[in-house]
């Protein structure tokens, strides 16, 4: 889901070469409602980003009650806290292992869902703007 990013062509070529078109769906941009529906249908949200300025997609998934598997790099650990399984974004084994844990362990999936909902409550545009205003006032 989303716009074509870094190394998209290589990933797309790999999908074609390995005949994975029926298993890997490249959806492009989705509207808010469609995205929420997708999060609600998913067993997990996997976000193996190597670089991320903030980490809005994992936060969106947590807000929708979707367990998260995310990269241990960049700002993502700070955003997800202990409410996600953190993985090495360059290791297929690490990603697959975390995905299998969530799929096979309903208790873990439920725990991550509940923690994710709580973690997501810590973030809002209103809260961020108030904190920024307080910083400016203190200068």
Where do the language-model regions lie?
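Glycosyltransferase donor-sugar binding loop
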Residues: 1-12
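Nucleotide-activated donor-binding/catalytic signature segment of Leloir-type glycosyltransferases, i.e.
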Residues: 10-36
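Acidic donor-binding loop of glycosyltransferase active sites
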Residues: 29, 38-56, 63-67
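Short glycine-rich donor-binding/catalytic loop of glycosyltransferases
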Residues: 50, 63-80, 89-92
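Conserved acidic donor-binding segment of nucleotide-sugar-dependent glycosyltransferases
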Residues: 85-92, 101-106
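A short, well-ordered alpha-helix in the C-terminal region of glycosyltransferases
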Residues: 94, 108-122, 130-134
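C-terminal alpha-helical cap of glycosyltransferases
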Residues: 100, 125-139
């Amino acid at each position: 889901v989303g716009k074509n990013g870094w190394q998209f062509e290589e990933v797309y070529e790999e999908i074609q070469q390995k005949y994975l078109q029926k298993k890997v769906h490249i959806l492009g941009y989705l509207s808010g409602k469609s995205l929420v529906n997708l999060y609600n249908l998913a067993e997990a949200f996997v976000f193996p980003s190597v670089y991320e300025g903030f980490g809005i997609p994992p936060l969106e998934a947590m807000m929708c009650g979707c367990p998260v598997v995310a990269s241990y790099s960049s700002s993502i650990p700070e955003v997800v806290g202990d409410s996600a399984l953190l993985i090495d974004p360059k290791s297929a084994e690490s990603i697959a292992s975390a995905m299998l844990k969530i799929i096979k362990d309903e208790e873990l999936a439920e725990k991550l869902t509940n923690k994710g909902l709580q973690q997501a409550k810590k973030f809002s545009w209103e809260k961020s703007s108030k904190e920024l205003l307080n910083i400016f006032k203190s200068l």
